[in-house]
Amino acid sequence: MGLPWYRVHTVVLNDPGRLLSVHIMHTALVAGWAGSMALYELAVFDPSDPVLDPMWRQGMFVIPFMTRLGITNSWGGWNITGGAITNPGIWSYEGVAGAHIVFSGLCFLAAIWHWVYWDLEIFCDERTGKPSLDLPKIFGIHLFLAGVACFGFGAFHVTGLYGPGIWVSDPYGLTGRIQSVNPAWGVEGFDPFVPGGVASHHIAAGTLGILAGLFHLSVRPPQRLYKGLRMGNIETVLSSSIAAVFFAAFVVAGTMWYGSATTPIELFGPTRYQWDQGYFQQEIYRRVGAGLAENQNLTEAWSKIPEKLAFYDYIGNNPAKGGLFRAGSMDNGDGIAVGWLGHPIFRDKEGHELFVRRMPTFFETFPVVLVDGDGIVRADVPFRRAESKYSVEQVGVTVEFYGGELNGISYSDPTTVKKYARRAQLGEIFELDRATLKSDGVFRSSPRGWFTFGHASFALLFFFGHIWHGARTLFRDVFAGIDPDLDAQVEFGAFQKLGDPTTRRQVV
């Protein structure tokens, strides 16, 4: 036919059988990719340390999505939370991957069948004998079925009535597990961090979809609306479908980047705003303060801080620190975390407790500045030693560790003190293994960052696609050059005001 590459889809424009075929093939490709990617990730995933080497540090992309829907066991005998299991059942990670691949194969065969047997009676208008689709009726059918699926997910899967529930955790990502969720019907259901909203919104949206589907199945659109919105044109379906997809992509880009109940930090890693706001640091200090109030000493209070909580409070886990085009997992960047060294507390020779000013998200380098509790600068690592007033050597800074591997150890050697001050800029200090994966020391983003970038980019692209195809279908007659008034509108001198038919010049 000699069509250019960007026009090849016109071959299914008036061919309902093959239009169905290519959509089934698309589903086969999507399901096949998901299943294959899951098997690849399972082949490279190391489940041995869910605290310091969780799935998001290893760059897993599809495993977190399976996990948040209730899959936690593997046929390899491990559980995502670290325990051993004996009977994982059919719906393990491998089982879900296999189901996607089998489904992909069936869709592949169905696509071939519909490509070969494209001229089916069901696609023909019995009055004209030509291929025709009743698009408003098809819209009603799809809306009804989508509503049933949406309602079923919210009412059965999420609530645990017939299903596992979803991943639910505390605000600091420490106690996450799969559990059933009761719908939240009050105003709290609109809080994006309340899991109950997932159940209630799916039930409500599903109910609305079922009712709307029945409406569109039983009520025909008015003729003027049908013609005005070009409801008989398949490109109208394309345009409105693209609109639904780009809107959803923008929404999930937001819920992923800013965080929500559907994107738990245990599965996707922390958000950048938790570093910016010192979210985990505040909770750590609150716990230490509570311990001191119970007459614990500093060592005891810091030793009770969960390693998982301390690890969140490390800039290397900030998804905004990795460049968008730095390929690889976080472990390929700063290395595999081995252990928490403990919390360093710096003091000058006068006994002031000093705090290292932390590096903001978008800095690659940052001056090492130590301030006291009032925010007054007491020490630093100067750029020019000749002009220094607050150097570690001059001020006599020492460091002592509480909790972690270096618990109870103190250093007064300026070189060592400066080393730990630099590392304290990046949050809690961890021992990182860079040898195993030949990690290069350059921070990487987490799957949270990749998902957001990908969905925001495609949403923008699809937004333009919606405008393009919407304009094509609405102004099809104009673009085709069959508008009877088109020549008159653009003819120079036909109107006093170009294109305004009310100002037509009178012929004398």
Swiss-Prot record:
A cellular-component GO term for this protein: photosystem II
Membership in a protein family: Belongs to the PsbB/PsbC family. PsbB subfamily.
NCBIfam families assigned: PS_II_CP47 (TIGR03039)
Name of the protein described by the UniProt record: Photosystem II CP47 reaction center protein
Top-rank taxon: Eukaryota
Subunit-level organization: PSII is composed of 1 copy each of membrane proteins PsbA, PsbB, PsbC, PsbD, PsbE, PsbF, PsbH, PsbI, PsbJ, PsbK, PsbL, PsbM, PsbT, PsbX, PsbY, PsbZ, Psb30/Ycf12, at least 3 peripheral proteins of the oxygen-evolving complex and a large number of cofactors. It forms dimeric complexes.
InterPro entries hit by this protein: PS_antenna-like (IPR000932), PS_II_antenna-like_sf (IPR036001), PSII_PsbB (IPR017486)
Membrane spanning stretches: 21-36, 101-115, 140-156, 203-218, 237-252, 457-472
Organism classification: Eukaryota, Viridiplantae, Streptophyta, Embryophyta, Tracheophyta
GO annotation terms (biological process): photosynthetic electron transport in photosystem II
Localization: Plastid, Chloroplast thylakoid membrane
Purpose of the protein: One of the components of the core complex of photosystem II (PSII). It binds chlorophyll and helps catalyze the primary light-induced photochemical processes of PSII. PSII is a light-driven water:plastoquinone oxidoreductase, using light energy to abstract electrons from H(2)O, generating O(2) and a proton gradient subsequently used for ATP formation.
Keyword Transferase on entry: no
